[in-house]
Amino acid sequence: MVLTKTATNDESVCTMFGSRYVRTTLPKYEIGENSIPKDAAYQIIKDELMLDGNPRLNLASFVTTWMEPECDKLIMDSINKNYVDMDEYPVTTELQNRCVNIIARLFNAPLEESETAVGVGTVGSSEAIMLAGLAFKRKWQNKRKAEGKPYDKPNIVTGANVQVCWEKFARYFEVELKEVNLSEGYYVMDPDKAAEMVDENTICVAAILGSTLNGEFEDVKRLNDLLVKKNEETGWNTPIHVDAASGGFIAPFIYPELEWDFRLPLVKSINVSGHKYGLVYAGIGWVVWRAAEDLPEELIFHINYLGADQPTFTLNFSKGSSQIIAQYYQLIRLGFEGYKNVMENCIENMVVLKEGIEKTERFNIVSKDQGVPVVAFSLKDHSFHNEFEISEMLRRFGWIVPAYTMPADAQHITVLRVVIREDFSRTLAERLVADISKVLHELDTLPSKISKKMGIEGIAENVKEKKMEKEILMEVIVGWRKFVKERKKMNGVC
């Protein structure tokens, strides 16, 4: 049968996938000449995004991937509010101030009942760390100027396990970064070594409450005690900043007796990520100071914008209000009891996953029981396969499990890491263990990539050696011929 009627040009009668918009390639790096229908734009983008990984199965990330529908609605209701318009959105500003005060008191800031805490909401812990670092640098510079001493070579002491934002701070704001190297079996900053590295130019020592490598808490109390002693001996006043990006919303609920916060006298500022275990979508972070004198007044800007004086201390200006509102929702919705329940569930699911991995008898666990709910583990035997192969094969099941090497002095250690978030259930933990076992079984039936690589390298080395032998032999032959030829020239015909 031959069709004699051509297809209609009326787009309104076509389904989305029958329209011309899915048959043509849109320009990727320049704006198109013509508009396209809204449903076409939506479908085209949605289809491309299907190739992204599933955020719920992204076990590499600490960032929250699930919130209650009521909070989702609040976020959408406030998505068009610019936070800097404080005079126009005074309630949003008030909610931020409430969050700052709740978090400061959660971290045991020495505040009177009616006293207002000093802190600010940020787009994440990276910005929070930049702000805290600037405050330390300015305080140190002011002190050195008053004493008539040089103030052009500030440094900061951290562990080699710090997040890259610390390196950014050091590079962007011209501060020397002095890192305490790690060692096998000890993957966090050693407080004794850190205290030894402190000198009169040290603006602060940064301790991590929840290393990104294995979730371990650094010993902030030990560091505080060592620095108190060193300050007394030297007359310095080296303070501590606690990077509690991951652990700040865990320790108060699970380890209330652990002294890491403003209970320690040298802890002057703390940052925490609301979008990690604060249980809010990216990106919201917080930084709070012990007292007003720990944040130099000259760093605070007073801006007359849209009719109101606005004190501000941020690295940007415009930003959304929705994440601040979402943080306030979680704080009042969950309360202490709710956060405690969530964190206990995370810890229990971490234990289930850890025990399941141990039962395979193929891995060493390098994470600690006390810390952020993370399971970091490495293969006992690397003769045939490695962690990167396991990470790659787990993606076939939908899991995103990162494999990486440790920092300086422990870089020969490779680990896999699973972050246990609120939405990682017991069922998923058991399923992941089963899928890891399947991957191990499959790897056992496959030829070793490592052996193959070594074999290829060995063959290449043999070829190289043979090539060198031939080259040497040819050089000898050419040299001998040249020698004989020269002899003939000198002696004539024999």
From Swiss-Prot:
Q: Where is this region: Calmodulin-binding?
A: 463-494
Which cofactor(s) does the record list?
Answer: pyridoxal 5'-phosphate
What EC number is given for this enzyme? 4.1.1.15
User: What does the free-text pH dependence field read?
Assistant: Optimum pH is 6.0.
Give all N6-(pyridoxal phosphate)lysine modified positions.
276
Q: What enzyme category does the UniProt record give? A: lyase
GO cellular component entries: cytosol; nucleus
The site feature described as Anchoring site for calmodulin binding is recorded at 488-489
Q: Which reaction does it catalyse?
A: L-glutamate + H(+) = 4-aminobutanoate + CO2
> Which CDD domains does the entry link to?
DOPA_deC_like
Q: What induces it?
A: Up-regulated by salt treatment. Up-regulated by nitrogen treatments such as ammonium chloride, ammonium nitrate, glutamate and glutamine but not by potassium nitrate. Down-regulated by hypoxia.
Inhibition and activation profile: Up-regulated by calmodulin binding at physiological pH.
* A GO biological-process term: glutamate metabolic process
Any one Gene Ontology MF annotation carried by this entry is: pyridoxal phosphate binding
The record ties this protein, via InterPro entries, to: Glutamate_decarboxylase, PyrdxlP-dep_de-COase, PyrdxlP-dep_Trfase, PyrdxlP-dep_Trfase_major
Has keyword Lyase?
A: yes
Tissue-wise expression: Expressed in roots, inflorescence stems, flowers, siliques and leaves.
Q: Does the keyword Cytoplasm apply?
A: no
What this chain does, per the entry, is described as: Catalyzes the conversion of glutamate to 4-aminobutanoate (GABA). The calmodulin-binding is calcium-dependent and it is proposed to directly or indirectly form a calcium regulated control of GABA biosynthesis.
Quaternary structure (record): Homohexamer. Interacts with calmodulin.
Domain free text: The C-terminus (463-494) binds calmodulin in a calcium-dependent fashion.
* Family named by the database record: Belongs to the group II decarboxylase family.
Kindly provide the name given to this protein in its UniProt entry: Glutamate decarboxylase 2
Q: Which gene encodes it?
A: GAD2
